Swiss-Prot record:
The gene is MGR1. One of its GO terms (cellular component) is mitochondrial inner membrane. It holds the Pfam family Mgr1. This is Mitochondrial inner membrane i-AAA protease complex subunit MGR1. It is found in: Mitochondrion inner membrane. The lineage of its organism: Eukaryota, Fungi, Dikarya, Ascomycota, Saccharomycotina. Residues 1-36 are annotated as: Disordered. Component of the mitochondrial inner membrane i-AAA protease complex.
Length: 406
């Protein structure tokens, strides 16, 4: 879709000025013009995937953050390479024996035996000799140990990132992968929809994770969920007053269990924190609490029954009922009867109720500027604006229209 302005009297002047101020550099992208066709040059850097990671060394071969099987595969391969470097260093640092000629002991004696004869002669195996390590072997071993340590350390950082309940890189890659599917494209299984976005920097990632950790810490402080240590040492969750620890039969709390539970409580809550399931659980609990309050007070059997049903409906339709909130004019969102046992299922159901995205996909804007005539018109001024002669050429016919101004 494009807009081509109609030609006017200033076209020639514009062409002359464009020729004088013409830029010699070629544009990256442009559209067709009446003067000619401009070639679009694609930036080759946009064809190279730039998936972020903490410690992977694969560069453009790094898979997308939302492709967990590929990420674990590359991490395992990097760990295997690091272990191979350690084995290389161990081989070069190990003492290698010097090959010797086979020693033959007298008959009846072993190689490592030692005995004195009548001639006071002693037979024993010669001492084992080893090759001396050169400086080159030591340098290669140190370099191999350093490289292997860096590879394994980077793999550990990547595993720690993938174990986080909230990973901005994962959410970003997953969002644009789904966006590409909605637009009719098929994103790459390994690299994702890397052509749709520029991954966020490490500084932005660190800022988002820090804010998430702060919010989790605040929620943990005010959360009423308690983690109780059972007799077998396992932690279980329960709803009750703030306080942790195993209470024995005498009603006293064990000091060791209390200390262990105090340490385990924030760790369990951060590790088991879900994204969408927890949001759904909070909404469900809030709705259940509100429903019980309404049924116990405003919607009890005394106020709501079949005898006053017609009166209640009339007040609701007229907007005079106490149950009508004038500030609320938005219907509730129903998630339907779809199964929501996991985060993926809940997210799939939730994405079906995005009105702005649906409106964007269903709406097609097409703007057309319709001129007064289908062909070029020539306007001539006669007698200082009092008489206009319009010459219109359309379909091979020529008409002269004379209009007098009042």
């Amino acid at each position: 879709m494009g807009y081509i302005p109609p030609p006017g009297d200033n076209d020639d002047n514009g062409k002359k000025s464009n020729k004088k101020t013409q830029n010699t550099s070629k544009p990256i992208s442009s559209d067709s013009t009446p003067d000619g066709t401009t070639i679009t040059i694609i930036n080759p850097m946009s064809l190279i995937p730039r998936n972020p990671s903490f410690g992977l060394i694969w560069g453009p071969l790094t898979p997308a953050s939302d492709n967990r099987p590929a990420m674990y595969t590359m991490v395992a391969l990097q760990i295997a390479i690091g272990v191979r470097f350690f084995r290389y260093a161990r081989t070069h640092l190990r003492r290698h024996p010097v090959p010797q000629a086979q020693f033959h002991a007298p008959p009846g004696l072993g190689v490592n035996s030692m005995i004195s004869t009548t001639a006071n002669q002693t037979y024993s195996a010669p001492p084992q000799q080893f090759l001396r390590r050169s400086k080159g072997d030591v340098f290669k071993s140190i370099l191999a140990i350093t490289t292997g340590s860096l590879l394994i350390f980077g793999s550990g950082l990547e595993i720690a990132r993938m174990m986080l309940p909230y990973d901005p890189w994962y959410d970003e890659a997953q969002f644009y992968r789904k966006q590409a599917v909605r637009n009719g494209d098929k994103p790459n299984f390994w690299f994702g929809a890397y052509q749709y976005y520029q991954p966020m920097t490490y500084k932005e990632w660190h800022s988002k994770v820090s804010k998430w950790i702060d919010s989790v810490e605040k929620e943990i402080k005010v959360d009423e969920t308690t983690f109780v240590i059972d007799k077998d040492g396992k932690a279980r969750g329960g709803i009750g007053p703030a306080g942790v620890g195993y209470v024995n039969g005498a009603g006293q709390q064990s000091g060791a269990a209390s200390a262990a539970a105090a340490v385990a409580k924030p760790l369990f809550q951060i590790r088991n924190r879900a994204k969408y399931q927890q949001i759904h659980a909070k909404l469900y609990n809030a709705n259940e609490t509100r429903m019980r309050e309404l049924l116990a007070n405003e919607l009890n059997d005394t106020n709501v029954n079949e005898l006053n049903k017609a009166e209640r409906l009339d007040k609701i339709l007229e907007g005079k009922s106490d149950l009508v909130n004038p500030n609320f004019n938005k219907p509730s969102i129903s998630l339907g009867n779809h199964p929501m046992e996991s985060d993926d299922e809940f997210e799939m159901v939730w994405l079906n109720f995005e009105p702005w995205d649906e409106l964007k996909m269903e709406t097609d804007y097409d703007i057309r500027l319709i001129p007064r005539y289908a062909s070029v018109e020539e306007l001539e001024q006669v007698d200082e604006g009092e008489l206009f002669v319009v010459k219109k050429e359309e379909l091979g016919e020529t008409d002269n229209v004379v209009n007098e101004s009042s």
